[in-house]
Every structure is written in C-alpha cells, then in structure tokens.
Regions:
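Class I SAM-dependent methyltransferase Rossmann-like catalytic core
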Residues: 54-91
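Conserved class I S-adenosyl-L-methionine
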Residues: 92-102
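A short acidic, Gly/Pro-enriched loop at the edge of an enzyme's catalytic core
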Residues: 94, 167-177
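A short glycine-rich, Lys/Arg-flanked "PGG" loop and its adjoining helix->strand segment in the class I
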Residues: 111-112, 192-205
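Conserved beta-strand signature within the Rossmann-like core of class I S-adenosyl-L-methionine
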Residues: 120-123, 206-214
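A short, conserved alpha-helix within the catalytic core of class I
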Residues: 162-163, 185-198
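C-terminal lobe and adjacent flexible extensions of AdoMet/dcAdoMet transferase-like proteins
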Residues: 286-310
Length: 310
C-alpha cells in the first residue's frame, strides 16, 4: 500500500539521520599562527620602559664607580642619587649645570652619565672669590676632577658668585640646573633671587630646575634658616615661582622622619659632619654622641622639580 511505503521511507530517513548525529565531528583544520596585534602605544610604552631601565642602570653604575671614594659611595643609601636623578628627568644627552658642586658628590655621578652624549657644567665659586674657604673648595674640586680625566675630561667650568659672576652660561643653553642643598647658603649670601634668575636665563624653554634642600618645619622662623641650614619648602616654592618657574612635582625620596631639625649645631650635627660631637673630649662619650646622630641619619630633605614654561 502506498501509505505503508511512505511510512517505511520516513522511518528509514529518521534512522539515517540518527546514525549521522552519532558520527565523530570533523576535525578542525590547523590554522596558520597569527602574531598578536600590538598597538602603537604599547610599543611606545615598552620602549620608554626599556629606556628608563637602561638609564637607571647607567646612573647606578656611575654611583658605584671605582672613581668614587668608599665614603661617598656609602652615602648613596641616604642621598639616593639614582631615584633622585630619575625623578628630575635626567637624560644622557642633556646639558646640566650643577651650581656650587662643593666636593663633587653629585658631579661624580653626573659626569659619567653625561660624558658621551651630554655636558656637565660645573658652576663653582670663583677661585679668586672673597670667601677663602669656598675658593679653596673650588681648587680642591678642580684638582680632584683632574685625577680622573677619563671620567671628568669633558666637564666644563664657569665661575658663579652673584653679583660679580652672575651668569651660568649662554641664554637658553641648558636643559637642567641642579641646586643641591644650597638654598641656605644663598639666603646667607643674600643672592637667592639672583641665583634663580640666572637659572631661569640659562635654561631652555621646558628646562628643569632641580632642587634638593634640607627641609625646615612649615612654621619655622626665617631667621633660623641661615643658622641651622634648614629651609621652609614654602619659601623655596615661592621664590622659584617668583623667578618664573612652575612647580611640576614634589617627591619624598629624600625625606627622613627621624630628623627632628632641633639639633644644637643645626643640620651639621647629622652625618656626615657630626659637628655636634667634635667638641666632646671623652672618647667614649664622643662615640656615643656620634652613634646617636648616625641613628637619625642624614637630614630630612625636600625634592622639587620645577620647569621653565615653554
């Protein structure tokens, strides 16, 4: 009968479909490897990170270099040159003016980093200046650099002591001016404004004014700044802004909460000077005095990055 044949056909079709559904799925065909898509910003970020790491390594090698004394290298833990110079934005191709480099602690780090692609300008107190100990410090500094021409041979020198020697270099010729722990000296000499004006003049637009300074309490009286070596952060910011700079960033890299700032000899009571202990005649008492101040460590310091507007 036709209806019986139709029913048989339908049943056969259903059985074939069921068998087909139990068969193994077709194996996926292998595809060619496709490289991950990397955005331009990711590539740029990676390159910047690599560059920062390389610079950090370069500064660290300079800070631990054989040209430095063990005593100066021992102070790296307190003065943190790697972190500080990276915060300021140091690059190996910069022209950096270091104002009153003193014994050359920072010059020892900057010179190797800048030797090949940049320039270090040491703006020292003039050797014919009327402050004998500062003039002698410059002579000693120059002699020390002469001992390692392979490190310091490219360092340039300019005398700087306003108002007689009031320029740090040709206008807009530098990328960074470093003022490390000298604001109290500028205050004592009455040249703070002149120093900042000279820094502004020598910097290119966008250039950096890098400041590290012993930090006074916010409510400290100004008279104490000359005596104790500590300066109010608000004063430094005010003076820099008056000279035309813009505060870009603050850092607590060089902060020391153990420093109470109330030492009889001011900041010089602390390491490395330990001046408060020099007059102690008894050796055991002197050792105890020095141990007390060493436990505090070096001073609490502000670390400020200003820029000259473009």
């Amino acid at each position: 009968m036709p209806s019986s044949r139709l029913l048989s056909c339908l049943l056969s079709a259903l059985l074939l479909a069921a068998c087909g559904s139990d068969s193994a799925p077709e194996a996926a065909q292998p595809q060619a490897d496709t490289p991950p898509v990397t955005s331009g910003s990711a590539v740029s970020d990676a390159a910047a990170s690599d560059e920062a790491d390389a610079l950090r390594q370069r500064i660290a090698e300079a800070a631990e270099g054989a040209h430095r004394s063990d005593a100066n290298k021992a102070r790296n833990a307190a003065r943190r040159p790697v972190e500080t110079l990276q915060f300021f934005g140091l690059r190996p191709d910069m022209t950096v003016v270091e104002v009153w480099p003193g014994g050359g602690w920072y010059s020892e780090v900057l010179a190797p980093v800048l030797r090949d692609g940049g320039t270090l300008v040491a703006a020292s107190y003039p050797m014919d200046g009327d402050v004998p100990f500062r003039a002698q410090m410059t002579r000693d500094y120059r002699a020390r650099l002469a001992e390692h021409p392979e490190v310091y041979g490219a360092v340039k020198h300019v005398p700087f002591a306003p108002p007689t020697y009031g320029e740090l270099g040709a206008p807009e010729s530098a990328d960074m001016v470093l003022l490390s722990r000298h604001f109290h000296n500028f205050i004592s000499a009455g040249i703070t404004d002149q120093v900042l004006q000279a820094a502004h003049a020598v910097l290119r637009p966008g250039g950096i004014l890098a400041v590290v300074q012993h930090r006074a309490a916010a409510d400290a009286v100004p008279e104490a700044e000359q005596r104790d070596g500590y300066v109010r952060e608000s004063y430094v910011v005010e003076k820099a802004e008056q000279a035309g700079f813009v505060l870009g960033a603050r850092s607590e890299i060089n902060a020391n909460p153990k420093d109470t700032r109330d030492h009889a000899m001011g900041v010089w009571a602390l390491p490395p000077s330990l001046r408060a202990c020099r007059s102690v005649e008894d050796e055991a008492e002197r050792d105890a005095c020095e141990e007390t101040y060493r436990a505090i460590g070096e001073s609490d310091r502000m670390t400020l990055r200003f820029t000259k507007p473009s």
